[in-house]
Structures are given as structure tokens and as C-alpha cells.
């Protein structure tokens, strides 16, 4: 059985970027629901004892009638696991070394990368994610709809940001651009 991990930080640790009410509701309600639904969908299947990455890369092992629901819920679980880890203020440090060099090579500079990341995040119609991924030896920014995960497309995820309104609405209402810009703080 898959279990949602407790956050490694307090709900208020992301303030002022994201307030504790948003973190609490987002993690304990939305994220937990993805885990609950995933567990219900994989019960009594060949994926029951597998991890999320395996599930998402082996969706063809389940009946087609539940495949889309499983992709959405396992994707929501996996994507949010990454999101909370990326946002962990304990791990927060400047991007440097090989990643910094790769970003500069792909986008010109970190500032140009941030602008492009925000721009792509604003293009997501409705709900989805904006990602920095690695394909072969190249970095690129992609977006996915709903809870689709780049690993199902063969990408290695560097990091991503949730642009579903529940991720930012209590703080930013409909101002997704402001949320995306402040997310890098």
C-alpha cells in the first residue's frame, strides 16, 4: 500500500510564498486523495506492491477501463511528492554546478530560464504543470495537462511547479504569473 509521506517541514515554512492554509489543504486533502484513489485502483492488480514510478511507467499492466483514472491519480501522487520535496526550505539552495551550467547552456542564463519557465507555465490552459526536464543530455521546459507526469513520456524530471489553481489561489487568486515568479524565491 502506498502512503503519503508527512511533510519534512511545518505548514507555515513556505510563507510568504504559500501560506500554511494552502499547504495544509493542498497536502492533506488534495495530495492524500490522489494516494487514496491510487491505492483503490491498484488493489488486487499486478501493480499493488509497486512504487509510483513503476506504476506510471507500466500503466499497460492494468485494465484499460481504469488506466486513465490510475494515470491521473498516480500522476497526482508522484507529481506532488516531487513538488513538496522541491519546495522543502531545508533543501533550498542556489542552483550551481552542473545544473547551473546546463541551464545556462540551454537558456542563456538563469534569469532567461526563469522567464521562459514562467512564460510556459502561463500557457497551461486550465490545470497542469510546468517542468524542467532532461531529454538525453538536453534540458527543456515542458508542460503537462492535469496530473500527467513527464516520466510517462520518457523524460527525467529536474523539477516542476503545480499550476492547478488549488496550489496558489488562496494567496494569489487568479494571478498565476505572480505565483510562478515568486515560486523561485
Which functions belong to the PLM regions below?
Residues 1-185:
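Feature for soluble, non-membrane regions of globular proteins
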Amino acid at each position: 500500500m502506498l502512503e503519503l509521506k508527512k511533510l519534512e517541514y511545518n505548514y507555515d515554512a513556505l510563507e510568504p510564498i504559500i501560506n500554511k492554509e494552502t499547504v495544509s489543504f493542498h497536502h492533506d486533502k488534495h495530495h492524500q486523495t490522489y494516494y487514496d484513489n491510487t491505492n483503490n485502483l491498484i488493489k488486487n492488480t499486478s501493480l499493488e506492491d509497486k512504487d509510483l514510478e513503476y506504476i506510471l511507467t507500466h500503466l499497460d499492466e492494468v485494465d484499460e477501463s481504469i488506466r486513465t483514472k490510475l494515470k491521473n491519480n498516480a500522476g497526482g501522487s508522484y507529481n506532488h511528492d516531487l513538488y513538496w520535496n522541491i519546495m522543502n526550505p531545508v533543501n533550498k539552495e542556489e542552483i550551481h554546478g552542473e545544473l547551473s551550467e546546463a541551464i545556462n547552456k540551454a537558456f542563456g542564463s538563469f534569469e532567461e530560464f526563469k522567464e521562459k519557465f514562467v512564460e510556459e507555465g502561463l500557457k497551461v490552459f486550465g490545470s497542469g504543470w510546468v517542468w524542467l526536464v532532461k531529454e538525453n543530455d538536453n534540458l527543456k521546459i515542458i508542460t503537462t495537462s492535469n496530473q500527467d507526469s513527464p516520466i510517462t513520456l520518457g523524460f527525467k524530471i529536474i523539477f516542476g511547479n503545480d499550476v492547478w489553481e488549488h496550489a496558489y489561489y488562496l494567496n494569489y487568486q487568479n494571478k498565476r504569473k505572480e505565483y510562478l515568479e515568486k515560486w523561485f524565491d
